[in-house]
């Protein structure tokens, strides 16, 4: 059984969950079944991953009367996509995720990004010239609509993803239901010490996405460093007789950060949760933290004039302009 962390709502959130971003249709159902069968009790989803229906098929096979798990045995997160930030769209978007996942409530529902895109059902709405269509809905207004989901029992808790410290404080200044989580990219090359500390000081739990550095990210370029191949990580892993992935996952949970590694390979899914039978020394914890180079892998980029640039940097709510 996995360890849990207690959220500000009192809910218990398992410290290791299965990430489902980039899990292709045809693979994600089996991945979720494999995860549930080897002890995972936390599944991280999002409408934008375009695979919640398959996740729902897996959940239906394992949850309910006469099956191996009850609904309250598992913790399911989903996320509101950028095109659904308008307050009139939030409830419908949540209900669509619930319908696809075949659930009556979510344990946690996050605003996926602080940036609103043009309304509609296209994941990335574009102008005729190919640039992305942004919308001026403010995330504060989106938050007010998110709070109604808690009041209606559609989500037990609500939270944020990819928000910077100023944006978190902005939400806290108006929140009736406080955000309980900020889910952000985090790994030994992007330790996020200041942001993690900021979240904790405001009673938010941090969840790390791409906790292993996302070696299969869509915009990886040849020659970019792969965290799992870092000789220093490999060396530490050997000394514990563990895999590099297990050592990094252990580092996250030992520092108090929830992590959601993605895999569709049953053997690796199982390995990724076998991290509760060893402990990293304080020295190794500090050593891994020292690998930080503030290197962000998960920012959609485009090529302009031969240079790779951040796609959404001109959005007024783009979060990564701030130091943290």
From Swiss-Prot:
Q: Where does NADP(+) bind?
A: 10-21, 44, 161-162, 210, 212, 214, 262-265, 268, 271-272
SUPFAM superfamilies with a match to the protein in the record: NAD(P)-linked oxidoreductase
Task: Cite a single GO BP annotation.
Answer: aldehyde catabolic process
- Where is it localised? Cytoplasm, Cytosol; Apical cell membrane
Which domain of life does the UniProt lineage start with?
Eukaryota
Where are the active-site residues found? 49
The GO terms this record gives for MF are: aldose reductase (NADPH) activity; S-nitrosoglutathione reductase (NADPH) activity
| Site residues by UniProt (Lowers pKa of active site Tyr) | 79
Which Pfam families does the record cross-reference, listed alphabetically? Aldo_ket_red
Keyword Transferase attached: no
A GO CC annotation given for this chain: cytosol
What is this enzyme's EC? 1.1.1.2, 1.6.-.-
The reaction(s) this protein catalyses: a primary alcohol + NADP(+) = an aldehyde + NADPH + H(+); S-nitroso-CoA + NADPH + H(+) = sulfinamide-CoA + NADP(+); S-nitrosoglutathione + NADPH + H(+) = S-(hydroxysulfenamide)glutathione + NADP(+)
- What keywords appear on the UniProt entry? Cell membrane, Cytoplasm, Membrane, NADP, Oxidoreductase
Under InterPro entries, the record lists: AKR, AKR1A, Aldo/ket_reductase_CS, NADP_OxRdtase_dom, NADP_OxRdtase_dom_sf
The keyword Membrane is annotated on this UniProt entry: yes
Q: Which family does it belong to?
A: Belongs to the aldo/keto reductase family.
Extract the PANTHER family matched here. Answer: ALDO/KETO REDUCTASE
**What does the function comment of this entry state?**
Catalyzes the NADPH-dependent reduction of a wide variety of carbonyl-containing compounds to their corresponding alcohols. Displays enzymatic activity towards endogenous metabolites such as aromatic and aliphatic aldehydes, ketones, monosaccharides and bile acids. Acts as an aldehyde-detoxification enzyme. Also acts as an inhibitor of protein S-nitrosylation by mediating degradation of S-nitroso-coenzyme A (S-nitroso-CoA), a cofactor required to S-nitrosylate proteins. Also acts as a S-nitroso-glutathione reductase by catalyzing the NADPH-dependent reduction of S-nitrosoglutathione.
Name of this chain's protein? Aldo-keto reductase family 1 member A1-A
Source species of the chain: Danio rerio (Zebrafish)
Instruction: Please spell out the taxonomic lineage of the organism that makes this protein.
Output: Eukaryota, Metazoa, Chordata, Craniata, Vertebrata
Q: Which gene encodes it?
A: akr1a1a
């Amino acid at each position: 059984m996995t360890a849990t962390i207690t959220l500000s709502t009192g809910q218990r959130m398992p410290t290791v969950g299965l990430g489902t971003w980039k899990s292709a249709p045809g693979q994600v159902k089996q991945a979720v079944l494999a995860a549930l069968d080897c002890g995972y009790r936390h599944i991280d989803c999002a409408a934008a991953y375009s695979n919640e229906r398959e996740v729902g098929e897996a959940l239906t096979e394992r949850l309910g009367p006469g099956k191996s798990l009850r609904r309250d045995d598992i913790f399911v997160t989903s996320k509101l996509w950028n095109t659904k930030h308008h307050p009139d769209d939030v409830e419908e978007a949540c209900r669509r995720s619930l319908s696809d996942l075949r659930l009556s409530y979510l344990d946690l529902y996050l605003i996926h990004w602080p940036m609103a895109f043009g309304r509609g059902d296209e994941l990335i709405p574009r102008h005729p010239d190919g640039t992305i269509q942004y919308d001026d809905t403010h995330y504060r207004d989106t938050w007010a609509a998110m709070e109604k989901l808690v009041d209606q029992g559609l989500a037990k808790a609500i939270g944020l993803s990819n928000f910077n410290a100023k944006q978190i404080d902005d939400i806290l200044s108006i929140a009736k239901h406080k955000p309980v989580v900020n889910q952000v990219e985090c790994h030994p090359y992007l330790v996020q010490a200041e942001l993690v500390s900021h979240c904790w000081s405001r009673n938010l739990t941090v969840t790390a996405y791409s906790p292993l550095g996302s070696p299969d990210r869509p915009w990886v370029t040849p020659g970019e460093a792969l965290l799992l191949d870092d000789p220093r990580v490999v060396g530490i892993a050997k000394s514990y007789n563990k895999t590099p992935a297990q050592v990094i996952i252990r580092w996250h949970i030992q520092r108090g950060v929830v992590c959601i590694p993605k895999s569709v390979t049953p053997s690796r899914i199982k390995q990724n949760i076998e991290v509760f039978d060893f402990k990293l020394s304080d020295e190794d914890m500090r050593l891994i933290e020292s690998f930080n180079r503030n290197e962000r892998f998960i920012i959609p980029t485009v090529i302009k004039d031969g240079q790779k640039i951040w796609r959404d940097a001109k959005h007024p709510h783009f979060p990564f302009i701030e130091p943290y």
